């Protein structure tokens, strides 16, 4: 019995450690406070952070492939934060959260980097999954929060982004 308990505990702790700094899970209330949402709604289409001009691109989709549920999988998002002049993305910046806005509805979520950063690359790529079942075929606004080593925050917006469908 002790051996089984120890093995179970080891597996549980291993799984709990998966996902890095912000495992993809429902966003805490901290991402939806009135103060944070005011920053989200005021987000600019481009920002200057850590000496670089930055823009946001997105790839939003819902999966309707045959193995998906009949009403499709929840929304997934890849967010590409790119330097305006194609210079190296500032290494001190990280993205920690994102919001997808559909009218008065908001999906707030943690994001995580999808792959290791390449030195000199102009883009930071982050990912989120488990969103609402909006669309496909509708436009939404997307906001990402960037932070630096001093924990200063910048909010960057991409307007009218299409939610696509995969079949």
List the predicted regions and their residue ranges.
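Post-signal peptide N-terminal segment of mature Sec-exported envelope proteins
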Residues: 25-49
């Amino acid at each position: 019995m002790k051996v089984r308990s120890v093995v179970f505990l080891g597996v549980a702790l291993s799984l709990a450690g998966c996902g890095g700094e912000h495992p993809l899970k429902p966003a805490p209330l901290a991402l939806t406070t009135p103060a944070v949402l005011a920053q989200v709604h005021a987000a600019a289409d481009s920002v200057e952070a850590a000496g670089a001009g930055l823009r946001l691109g997105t790839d939003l989709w819902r999966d309707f492939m045959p193995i998906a549920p009949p009403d499709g999988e929840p929304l997934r998002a890849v967010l590409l934060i790119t330097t305006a002049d194609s210079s190296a993305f500032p290494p001190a910046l990280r993205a920690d959260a994102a919001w997808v806005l559909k009218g008065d509805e908001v999906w707030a979520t943690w994001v995580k980097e999808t792959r290791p950063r390449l030195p000199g690359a102009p883009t930071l790529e982050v990912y989120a999954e488990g969103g609402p079942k909006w669309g496909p075929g509708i436009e939404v606004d997307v906001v990402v929060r960037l932070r630096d080593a001093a924990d200063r925050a910048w909010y960057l917006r991409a307007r009218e982004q299409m939610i696509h469908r995969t079949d």
